[in-house]
Amino acid sequence: MPSNKIILEVITDEKHVPETIRWEAPQIMEKGECKSIALALWDGKENNTLRMDVWTKDMTTDEMKKFLLQSIITFCDTYERATSDSALADKIKQFIINIAKEEKVI
């Protein structure tokens, strides 16, 4: 059966604080570095979301605000594609866009 891999590597300092985050998608020959990862996994047995959030020590508060608000907006797009509930997706997205404008991150 075909499979694809996404490789995440977190390099830490001696206190285990992330310094560098690298990612690689070998099947499409893409790789790079990033400052933050927000990974959500669905545990079907527990009927619950598992989260893994990692960010480097040089990521600024403003970058984190922008990253999180943009992530929520993209989750709205995912929600709409998965459920066809455009009304709720649009409502949440507009709410987050308003917050992002207030915070001056968009």
Name each region found by the language model:
Residues 19-84:
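Active-site- and interface-proximal helix/loop "cap" or "latch" segments in soluble metabolic
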Residues 76-106:
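C-terminal charged interaction modules
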Residues 1-4:
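Short loop/turn motifs at secondary-structure junctions and domain boundaries
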Residues 6-25:
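Active-site and channel-lining beta-strand-loop segments
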Residues 16, 60-65, 95-103:
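Short amphipathic alpha-helical patches
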